Amino acid sequence: YDKAEETVSVEVINPTTGSVKCVVAGEITGENIRFSKEISLFCGETREIVFTPEEFPQLKIDNLRLWWPLFKGKPDLYELKMTVSVKGQVSDSLKTRFGIREITSDQNTPDKSRQFYVNGKKIFIRGTNWIPEGMLRHSDERTYAELRYTKQSGVNLVRMWGGGIAESDYFFQLCDEMGLLVWQEFWLTGDTKHPHDQALYLANLESTVKRLRNHPSLAYYVSSNESTEVVGAKDLIMKLDGTRGYQMQSECDGVHDGSPYKQVNPMQHYENTASPRGSRVDGFNPEYGAPTLPTLETLREVMDEKDLWPINKEVWDYHDGGGFHLMSTMYKDLVNNYGTSQSIEEFAKKGQLVGAMNSKTIWEVWNYNKLDYGDRYCSGLLFWYHNCPVRQVCARMWDWSLEPTASLYHTQNALEPLHAQFDYLKNMVSVCNDYYRSFKNYKVKADVYDLNSKKVFSYSQRIDIGEDEVLNDLFKIDFPSDITPVHFIRLGLS
């Protein structure tokens, strides 16, 4: 990918009562690329003006600066300026940024799961689901904070869940700059019916696609979440933007149904038994995740002290979607595995550890099974979900007040682009490389300490790891038979 042929189109409107002759001109700033056309418009006419590389060879661009997702390269952007002039005077102008990249997908995988490619290279999707703020109380400050956390976590794709909205221009601008891919759904979900006014829906769809299609971060169109498309939606989307892939709903065409959604014993992720629906660490999973208890400060924002401790199940369940995530039962039992708590302060601290360990385990299990390196082919995971739309006891990487939980930092660790990890089922150490570059003569080291900080095991190994590769089961950690029940593992790469 060292050359590109760009096509530029712009709608020009003549709102006057007479015919107008005008010049439509464009410039890719900083690249010495200019092009223009003289046209005539009838009164009230709207026309799409297209500049093709065949007609304007200067739109054949050499020495490309490609746009890449997070960890894959730099998300380079270009700027396009367009003007329309009448009798030598600029009547209107616009400015937009765009990126040069190619995003495709297919089902040429062992299990026919959907595989994405960026600029011709396979990309393992380590993504997440985005739920809009519960009352749509958006601000640029909140949007920036949430996307900054999203990038910090290391995920590379954000799914705009079908029960949500199409986010702001500023949201997509930040995704462009941060290298975050976006999977856009269009306001239909399995627990709602089709719109009463389909013409209005399609008009809104057209407006949204036109608004978002210049953003290089926009990667994929999906009509709905677990539902069917509105008749005519696919044809309209493809007419407006044939450069991106499309599927009817979130669980078809190589994307299977999701789960799990609740906390489980972390070992179940390694065993691939975390979902009651069967194997879900395989193929492309659009919804796989678990909640995390928010910080104590946030819990005190959610409910009165008398309901916090001892846990008032009725109140906790109300702030858990009717008890959907089992925070007052299953999550409580997992916290109690670290000892019965005597106060909400103690419970909240242990609750952070439970959520963090589950999040880290989920990501590391998917790292292990990345593409064709693991026990089964995995092309992508979308975590369910990572932001927090309302005050609730089932927080995610951060809570509604934008206070991070331990899950953010454990996810950040698991998704670092060059990462050493431990399999608690096999006692094996592996290394995952998410860069499109190789690393030679790196040392992976494992140290084990008992509860008294005494080192009881140490081993290191030199490795060469190729681009986007996983080296699984490099060596086993042999734990001494007399090790303290609580012990610590430290992994390092250097």
Over which residues does each language-model region extend?
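Active-site region of glycoside hydrolase catalytic domains
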Residues: 92, 206-314
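Substrate-binding clefts and catalytic carboxylate motifs of secreted carbohydrate-active enzymes
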Residues: 272-447, 455-458
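Active-site-adjacent substrate/metal-binding segments within catalytic domains
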Residues: 89-220, 317-356, 431
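Secreted/periplasmic carbohydrate-active enzymes, especially glycoside hydrolases
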Residues: 1-161, 166, 368, 372-378, ...
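Alpha-helical structural signal in soluble globular domains
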Residues: 83-85, 170, 174-180, 211, ...
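Flexible loop/turn segments at secondary-structure boundaries
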Residues: 106, 132-134, 165-168, 190-192, ...
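Beta-sheet entry/capping signal
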Residues: 156-157, 179-181, 219-220, 243-245, ...
